[in-house]
Design a protein with these regions (language model features):
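Compositionally biased terminal segments of proteins
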Residues: 1-298
Length: 298
C-alpha cells in the first residue's frame, strides 16, 4: 500500500481513527493486551504530547503498527482471542497488489468510510532470520517479521489513551505500551535505511526535535540503552543515522538522503526559488539535529 510522499497527504481525522482502532483492539484482548506494543507512525502522538502551536504539526498516520509477542501466535487461546477480536471489529484480511490476502495486514472502514489498516509485526530471527517477511501460519493470522522490533519489549513507555470505540460502543480508556524515543528512533532508522520512505525520516527527526525535555534527555536515554542488553542493535541504528544524516568528508550532511527526505516530505517538491531555499534550510536543521545527537552520545 503506497503511502503519501508529502505531509499534505495526511489528515488529522485519520490519525484519530487509528487511535480508535488501537483502543478498540486492546479493549477486547483481555490479558493478552500486555503483549502488544505500539510502534510506527502513531507513536509520535505520545512521544511528543505537545500540540500546535507549541510545536509544528506531526503528519500523523494512516495505519496502526503493533509488535506482538510470539506467544500470542503460539498460544491457541490467545490466537483465537486476537482473531475473534479482529472479526468483531469488522476487520478483514487486506490484499497485496497481486490480489493475494495477507495474514499480517488487516483492514476495516470507519463509520464515515475511512480505510483503517492494522499491521501485526513480530521479531522472529529463529524463523525468518534478518529478513522482512511474513511468518508462516496455518491459520488466518500471522505477523510480518521485522528484525530487532523486539527491543520495544524492553524500551517502551506507557500512555493512557481515551477514544471512542469502533461500532458506537462508547468511550474507553486503555493503557498503551509504545516505543520509547530510543526504540522508536532505532526502528525508524532501520525502516528508512531499508525502504527509503520520506515519512520514516520525518517521524524520527520530529520526535527527537520536539522531545518534551529537550535533546539532552534523548542523549541520556541513548546512553542508558548503550549500556544495556540492546547495545549492539542501538549502535547499528546510530551507524545508519550517521550514514544517512551526518557530516563526513565526502558529503555535507544536509545534502544526504535523510535530510532531503525530511524536507521534501514536510515542504513538498515545488521548484520555485523560495521553496528550494526553504528545503535547504530544513535539510540543514535536520542534519544539524542528528549531528548534535550523535556528538552528545559520543
Amino acid at each position: 500500500m503506497a503511502k503519501p510522499s508529502t505531509l499534505d497527504g495526511y489528515r488529522d481525522e485519520c490519525t484519530l481513527d487509528c487511535e480508535r482502532v488501537l483502543v478498540t483492539l486492546l479493549r477486547g484482548l483481555g490479558p493478552w493486551k500486555d503483549s502488544v506494543y505500539l510502534v510506527g507512525g502513531l507513536t509520535p502522538r505520545y512521544l511528543v504530547p505537545a500540540r500546535p502551536p507549541v510545536v509544528p504539526a506531526h503528519a500523523g498516520t494512516l495505519d496502526v503498527d503493533i509488535v506482538i509477542d510470539l506467544q500470542i501466535l503460539a498460544d491457541t487461546e490467545a490466537y483465537h482471542t486476537l482473531e475473534e477480536n479482529l472479526k468483531r471489529m469488522g476487520f478483514e484480511r487486506a490484499e497485496n497488489e497481486q490480489g493475494v490476502q495477507l495474514s499480517w495486514r488487516w483492514q476495516t472502514r470507519t463509520e464515515h468510510g475511512a480505510l483503517m489498516v492494522l499491521e501485526l509485526l513480530a521479531d522472529a530471527p529463529q524463523i525468518a532470520g534478518g529478513r522482512v517477511q511474513p511468518l508462516p501460519t496455518e491459520g488466518t493470522i500471522s505477523a510480518l517479521n521485522i528484525p530487532h522490533s523486539s527491543i520495544v519489549f524492553d524500551l517502551y513507555q506507557v500512555a493512557e489513551i481515551r477514544a471512542e470505540l469502533l461500532g458506537g460502543n462508547g468511550v474507553a480508556t486503555e493503557r498503551v505500551k509504545h516505543a520509547d524515543i530510543v526504540s522508536f528512533t532505532c526502528l525508524k532508522a532501520f525502516a528508512f535505511d531499508q525502504r527509503f520512505e520520506r515519512k520514516d525520516a520525518h517521524d524520527l527527526v520530529y520526535c527527537i526535535e520536539h522531545a518534551p525535555e529537550g535533546l539532552d534527555t534523548v542523549v541520556a536515554a541513548f546512553a542508558r540503552a548503550l549500556a544495556g542488553k540492546h547495545a549492539a542493535v542501538v549502535r547499528e541504528a546510530l551507524d545508519i543515522l550517521r550514514r544517512r544524516f551526518a557530516d563526513e568528508e565526502a558529503t555535507e550532511a544536509y545534502r544526504k538522503d535523510g535530510p532531503v527526505a525530511v524536507a521534501k516530505f514536510e515542504l513538498g517538491e515545488g521548484d520555485d526559488a523560495g521553496q528550494r531555499e526553504a528545503r535547504v534550510l530544513r535539510q540543514r536543521q535536520a542534519s544539524d539535529l542528528i549531528d548534535r545527537l550523535l556528538s552528545g552520545i559520543g
